[in-house]
Amino acid sequence: MPQMAPISWLLLFIIFSITFILFCSINYYSYTPNSPKSNELKNINLNSMNWKW
């Protein structure tokens, strides 16, 4: 049974590492959080607290 040369293991590790980094970065940048609706923003601005000292 033939054995793999060390350079082949290094190349395999580099390929899997690049694939893992690309997969993680694509998942990170493809996430789009839900932005608050304009109605909610208006309610937040209207209900602001006025401090009376």
Curated annotation (Swiss-Prot):
Q: How does it sit in the membrane?
A: Single-pass membrane protein
Quaternary data? F-type ATPases have 2 components, CF(1) - the catalytic core - and CF(0) - the membrane proton channel.
Q: Family per UniProt?
A: Belongs to the ATPase protein 8 family.
Q: Which GO terms describe its molecular function?
A: proton transmembrane transporter activity
Q: Subcellular localization, per the record?
A: Mitochondrion membrane
Protein keywords: ATP synthesis, CF(0), Hydrogen ion transport, Ion transport, Membrane, Mitochondrion, Transmembrane, Transmembrane helix, Transport
Q: What is this protein called?
A: ATP synthase protein 8
Where are the membrane-spanning stretches?
A: 4-24
GO terms for biological process? proton motive force-driven ATP synthesis
- Cellular component annotations (GO), alphabetically ordered: mitochondrial membrane; proton-transporting ATP synthase complex
